[in-house]
A protein has these predicted regions:
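N-terminal secretory targeting modules
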Residues: 1-133
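Conserved SGNH/GDSL esterase-like catalytic core that processes O-acyl groups on lipids
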Residues: 92-96, 103-112, 127-173
Length: 173
């Protein structure tokens, strides 16, 4: 907070964007929902709303073998939304790894994850193969500019391919 007043106005705002953020957990749920609160609405005409303020979901057994499942859809005129990724009564209830990629251009104030109340959930503490990290610093392309959804920014693609945490310090403009 001490440094923010010294930054140019746009960097101050962009520093709150959640590009590169993830929530990773194991669960045997057959229901997955999110409830999201964003700081403000987004209307960037050159980029899909799903990339700007959507969350996308990957499911698998390990981070390296994850498959894209779905991206949240929402009313882009609102700062709060709820989205159900799935609600399958007959879904195989074995433990799976779930990774939610956070929006590329939104400042997320709150995200709540809802699962079946009879299901187990635990944080994924072993997501990456090693403790090393790759730090990316750059402009809008690094932040994820114009990607159709959060998991398609190049830093997230590399993170999945290499199994390593990528820290995204991309700032548009």
């Amino acid at each position: 907070d001490e440094i923010l007043p010294q930054l140019e106005g746009s960097v101050d705002v962009l520093a709150g964007n959640s590009s590169g953020g993830i929530a990773a957990f194991y669960s045997n749920t057959n229901v997955l929902k999110i409830k999201v609160k964003l700081s403000f609405k987004f209307h960037m005409g050159h980029m899909p709303y799903t990339g700007q303020a959507g969350f996308d979901l990957y499911i698998g057994n390990t981070y390296h073998d994850m498959k894209f499942y779905r991206t949240s859809n929402f009313d882009f005129n609102k700062t709060e939304y709820e989205f159900t990724y799935f609600n399958h009564a007959n879904m195989n209830e074995e433990n799976k790894l779930f990774v939610l990629n956070f929006p590329l251009y939104a400042t997320v104030e709150e995200v709540l994850i809802g699962i079946n109340p009879n299901s187990d959930i635990s944080p994924c503490l072993d997501l990456f193969k090693n403790e090393d990290k790759i730090v990316f610093y750059g402009t809008s392309i690094t932040q994820g500019g114009c990607a159709s959804r959060p998991g398609m920014s190049y830093t997230q693609i590399l993170s999945r391919m290499l199994g390593i945490e990528c820290l995204n310090y991309g700032f548009s403009g």
